[in-house]
Amino acid sequence: MAKEGTTVIGVPYYAGQNPYQAGIVPPNAIYGDPLGAPIQQTIYRDTPAPFNCLYCGNTGLTNLRSKPGVAAVVACMMPFMLGFCFLCPSMDCLWNKQHHCPQCGNKVADFEKSDPCLVMDPPQWKQPSFALPA
């Protein structure tokens, strides 16, 4: 029972009237991710955060710069009345944070302490850093 071998061409490919249906890529096709829209939302708190810089395109961790805010001033008034004025610079957890790109130096985000009467934040006390893997 030998079968005769015939050449099979395969499934015929029919192209329609639209050239894009024939496999041509349209000229306005978007390849990859758009550069201006963030893929994920970065939460900027008082620790370095992973980010994508909108100015230079760098990917990495932000550099933090601390600036005294209202919460730091109110918290420093209490020890100052008791004579402990050396505690003012050591209360870094109450200072506002500015996140900067390490490559170009542009400011990426601000994190401000919103409640001047809150000296410590117990629910967020053990919040893990976004920069370190869990």
From Swiss-Prot:
What the entry says about domains is: The LITAF domain is stabilized by a bound zinc ion. The LITAF amphipathic helix region (68-90) is necessary for plasma membrane localization. Both N-terminal (1-47) and C-terminal (114-134) domains are sufficient for the interaction with MIEL1 or with the N-terminal domain of LSD1.
Sites binding Zn(2+) sit at: C53, C56, C101, C104
Q: Where is this region: Membrane-binding amphipathic helix?
A: 68-88
User: Which GO biological process categories is it annotated with?
Assistant: cellular response to hypoxia; negative regulation of plant-type hypersensitive response
Q: What name does this protein carry?
A: GSH-induced LITAF domain protein
Instruction: Name the gene that codes for it.
Output: GILP
| Key word Ribosomal protein present | no
Role description: Acts as a membrane anchor, bringing other regulators of programmed cell death (PCD) to the plasma membrane. Negatively regulates hypersensitive cell death.
